[in-house]
């Protein structure tokens, strides 16, 4: 499980995928999110700009990313 420490109140979903090394670019993040390959807290998420806060969990391609403060 990858852990992302928040520097601000939130991080956007596309940025979180890049920070965790799950994707190589913002374009790649946009594509996998739009295709419904990413879940936030167990629900498929289609918005790249979705704000993630402390306690949120992202799953993509068998990887889990936990958002912490």
Give residue spans per PLM region.
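A positively charged, amphipathic N-terminal helix/segment that binds anionic biomolecules
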Residues: 3, 57-69
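A basic, amphipathic helix-loop patch mediating RNA/tRNA/ribosome contacts
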Residues: 9-54
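A detector for short, charged/polar N-terminal pre-domain segments
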Residues: 1-11
């Amino acid at each position: 499980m990858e852990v992302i420490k928040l520097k601000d109140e939130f991080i956007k979903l596309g940025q979180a995928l890049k920070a965790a090394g799950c994707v190589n670019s913002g374009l790649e993040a946009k594509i996998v999110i739009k295709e419904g390959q990413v879940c936030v807290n167990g629900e498929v998420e289609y918005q790249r700009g979705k704000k993630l806060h402390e306690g949120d969990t992202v799953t993509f391609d068998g990887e889990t990313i936990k958002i912490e403060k």
